[in-house]
From Swiss-Prot:
InterPro entries attached to this UniProt entry: PIG-V/Gpi18
Organism: Candida glabrata (strain ATCC 2001 / BCRC 20586 / JCM 3761 / NBRC 0622 / NRRL Y-65 / CBS 138)
Compartments (UniProt record): Endoplasmic reticulum membrane
Enzyme's top EC category: transferase
Designated name of the protein: GPI mannosyltransferase 2
GO molecular function, one term: glycolipid mannosyltransferase activity
Residue spans crossing the bilayer: 4-24, 109-129, 148-165, 172-194, 204-226, 247-267, 322-342, 354-374, 410-430
Taxonomic lineage: Eukaryota, Fungi, Dikarya, Ascomycota, Saccharomycotina
Amino acid sequence: MHSLVKPVLFFVVVRIVQYAIISLSPNKQFDLSTNLLLAKYCSEQETQQFWHRHLFNKLLSWDSVFFIKTAMTMDGYPEYEHEWAFSVIWSSLIRSVSPSNNFYTVLKTAVILENLIYFMAMITLFYLTRITFGKLDKSKTHLSDKLATFTAILFSCNSGSGFFTGPYSEPLSFLFSFLGILAREFSVTPIIPYGLEFKSSKIFYYTIVSSFCFTIATLNRSNCILLGFYYVFDSIYLIRRQKYKKALLFPVLAGCIVALFFVRQQFYIPYKNFCELRGEWCNESLINFKPLHFLTRKSLYSYIQSEHWNLGLFNYWTPNNIPNFLFGLPTFVILFSSTFYFSRVYPNYKLKPLIFITRAFTIIILLFAHVQIINRISTFIPLHLWYISDRFVKFEANKKMTGDDWIVKGYIYWLIFWVPIQTSLFVFFLPPA
C-alpha cells in the first residue's frame, strides 16, 4: 500500500493542475458545437453561472459533445448516423449513473465518473505491473514495486490525459483492458524459459472474467478487439502441445465470447436497425445466406469512419496532415521502441502477445487512421509505459545512459511540455483531436 502513495498524490496534483489550466483559460472556443449543445438544453442563466462558465462548459469539447448529447436523448441512442461512432456504452453509463436528466447534473456526473474510472485504471495498472514483472523474476520483487510505482505515475500524465479531464470514453476501456490482462496473468503461470501453465482451478478468471473485461473494453472502443490476440496466442500454444481440452475451455471459449459480442454490436444490431430501407454498406453481405446477411463487408462503424472521416489505407497521408503526424510521432516512436526492447530484453511468453498487439495497433493507426489519435487511445496497451519505467529503474540503479535511455528521456521531456499544451488546446476546441 505504501508504494501507492506516490502515484495517488501525483494523480491528484496532475488533475488539480490540469483543471486549473482549464479554469484560467479564456472562455471562447474555436468551434460552435458547445454553444449549440448548451443552447439546446440550458438557459442563459444556467450557462453563465461561475463554475459552469469557467470549467464545465469548457469540458464540452470534441468527442465529449457527442457523449453528453447522446446521454441526454430520450431513448439513450444517438440522433444522427455519424454519432454512432461514439461509444453508446459510455453515454448509457453516464445516463444510468446520473441522479437526474438535468444537463449540468449529467455533465458533472460524467466528469466525476471519468475521473473515478481513470483513477481506478491507474490502481489496476499498478497491480498488473507488479504481478507481471514479479512473476517474470521473483528474485526482484522490490524492483517490480518500483516499476509499478513509476508506471502508475506515468499513466496519470499519459499523452492523452488532457482529453480525460472531460467526459471521454477511453479510460473505461483502459480500466477493463487492464482488468482483463490482470485476470489472464492471475490464471497463467510462466514456466522458465519458454512455457505457460494454465491452471484448471483458475478457469473462471481466464474464461469468464478476462473475456467479460475484454468485451466491455471492445464494445466501448473497437480498437480493443486486438486484445483478442491473447486468446489466439494461447490457443496456438496449447494446440501445439496437444492440450486440446484446455485450448477449448480456456482461450477458444473466451475468444468466442468476445467475438460474438463484437459481431453483435458491430454487425447484427446495426443491420437490424438500419438496413431494411437503405443500400450502401447494407448491400455488401459476405455470405449469401439470409440469416447471416448481417455479416457485411463493412460494419456500421467502419462505414461511418470512411464516409464521414475519410478513414482508409493512406487516406491521411497528405501534405496538410504533416503537423498531425508530428503530433503523433513521439508516441509512435515510444510504442515501436517498447516492442523491440521487450523482444530483446524479456523474451518471455507472458509478454509476447502484448508485443504483437502493440505492433499491430501501431501499424493500423499509422496506415488507416487519423494518426494523431494515437496519443489518446494507445494507453489501453501498457507496454510502452513498462518500457519507460523499466529504463528509469535500471538507469537509477547503474547511472549509465543507453540508446533506449535517450529515447525515454526525450519522450518524458516531450510529455512535460505536451500534457499542459494539449490540455489547453482541448479547452479551446483546437486540434489535435
